[in-house]
Amino acid sequence: MGNPQTTIAYSLHHPRASLTSALPDAAQVVHVFESGTRAVLTRGRARQDRLPRGGVVIQHTPIGLLVIIDCRAEFCAYRFIGRASTQRLERWWDAHMYAYPFDSWVSSSHGESVRSATAGILTVVWTPDTIYITATIYGTAPEAARGCDNAPLDVRPTTPPAPVSPTAGEFPANTTDLLVEVLREIQISPTLDDADPTPGT
């Protein structure tokens, strides 16, 4: 697939299961977490934000794998669309680790909604005190993708790449949210014709 173009990584600390934690045997998993972080890396830029207490939903559906992170003020929902409607998270049985390759994905946050015909892989790692959810998105659509007639996504920053702090790992609080910026760039990308309009427009 080549080098990843965008990585979105969540670390959710001190999770407590509201329903079930057996991903392969359940259609839905609901957890509450006490705190967390969200990191976004794209084309030389990086940002990490702290997340307050919130909830996470991971759900198998006929239209893909849903991941919802809801911290009230911070909200983002993702739908990762696999190559078959029966595709499930694949588990490496010697570890609490799951993988879900996808051919396209949909994401919605506060004020932004977008669909992208680009492939990648979602991984979910469970530890006793943290859930790690990472979406690695590549800049070219797979040759075997079906139902996607659009050109590959090429996410380009509208401003020169900013250097990543080697110590803090976070940008100032007043910096524009990089995830929202990435979603907005995908939405207005002239190479992607099927971007969803912003809700309410």
Curated annotation (Swiss-Prot):
Belongs to the alphaherpesvirinae HHV-1 UL4 family. Keywords: Host nucleus. This is Nuclear protein UL4. Its main location: host cell. It is found in: Host nucleus. InterPro entries: Herpes_UL4 (IPR004958). It comes from Human herpesvirus 2 (strain HG52). GO terms for cellular component: host cell nucleus. The keyword Nucleotidyltransferase does not apply.
